[in-house]
Amino acid sequence: MSIKIAIDAMGGDHGIKVTVPASLEALSKFSDISIVLVGNQPLIEAELANHKYDKNRLSVEHAEQIVEMDDLPSKALRNKRKSSMRIALNLVKDDVAQACVSAGNTGALMAVSKFVLKTLPGIDRPAICTQMPTMKGHVHVLDLGANVGADGQSLAQFAVMGSVLAQAVDSNSRPRVGLLNIGEEEIKGHQRIKDANEILKSSDAINYVGYVEGDEIFKGDVDVVSCDGFDGNVALKASEGVAKMISFYLRAAFNKNLLTKLAGLVVYPVLKAFKAKVDPRRYNGASFLGLRKIVIKSHGGADVFSFYHAIAEARLEVNKNVPELIATEVKAILETH
């Protein structure tokens, strides 16, 4: 199967300086994909001139406009119809491409994606989902900011979508799914969390294990965590901050004097493995779950390594037919309510 991925080449903080080389890296790693770079054609072709690549597997689609990182979603929808983001999504809508990857404005990308691609039947709100490292591997957490104040029905839908994604990309036939809460007791939490808990307990569609607290996200005892967008975004940013703090203190400790520097050389392979494990760049590529087609959001400040991983995530989800699987599972759980 040949997969075509539409890249919003102008999106993000670094634009074509990141998206073009990352796309070429993906082409070199995956023989089953082709890429269409959407954006300012003269600028993209000037950047491509600095690289060697298979011209049969890469094309350029010109776009006159760019969705800026500070553009309101409404502006992106109404006034940026010829933007690289909008055209890339249109290519997916028209089945020219099977997935879109963008490092652009998150709010704008979600709004335009919902307008162009629409949501799956039974899905009220799409959710942003990404992987976070744990003691035993990784966990899929959603929502990460698209939905603040999600109701119980939406939280239950997030749980189902996250479970489907974990089954597909991790080959996990029965992923353990939890609801983020301030305690494990039934009486704790907002009413919407309690409502989602009741919905999920009454269904056999997923392997629901109950409430999980914030510290349990990283233990590796659950594979999926469903939460409100506000809570999820705070958890994600806090985990990234803690990883940076630990790295800072480790560097400071091993650079203290000659003896600690020598000790650092001895344990360098261990530290390198640790850094790779918690490096957020490896987990770049958040899925917009609940849409009819695949959209992957890269971090706005992504470097080439990070953006490459977002493209790899898009390829994986196309291969696994994630939207179709989500539609089937959501239908099953809705039929019980």
UniProtKB/Swiss-Prot annotation:
It comes from the Bacteria. Its EC number is 2.3.1.274. Pathway: Lipid metabolism; phospholipid metabolism. Keywords: Cytoplasm, Lipid biosynthesis, Lipid metabolism, Phospholipid biosynthesis, Phospholipid metabolism, Transferase. It holds the Pfam family FA_synthesis. GO terms for cellular component: cytoplasm. Belongs to the PlsX family. SUPFAM superfamilies: Isocitrate/Isopropylmalate dehydrogenase-like. GO terms for biological process: fatty acid biosynthetic process; phospholipid biosynthetic process. Homodimer. Probably interacts with PlsY. The keyword Ligase does not apply. It is found in: Cytoplasm. Its main location: cytoplasm. The keyword Lipid metabolism applies. It comes from Hydrogenovibrio crunogenus (strain DSM 25203 / XCL-2). It catalyses: a fatty acyl-[ACP] + phosphate = an acyl phosphate + holo-[ACP]. GO terms for molecular function: phosphate:acyl-[acyl carrier protein] acyltransferase activity. Catalyzes the reversible formation of acyl-phosphate (acyl-PO(4)) from acyl-[acyl-carrier-protein] (acyl-ACP). This enzyme utilizes acyl-ACP as fatty acyl donor, but not acyl-CoA. This is Phosphate acyltransferase.
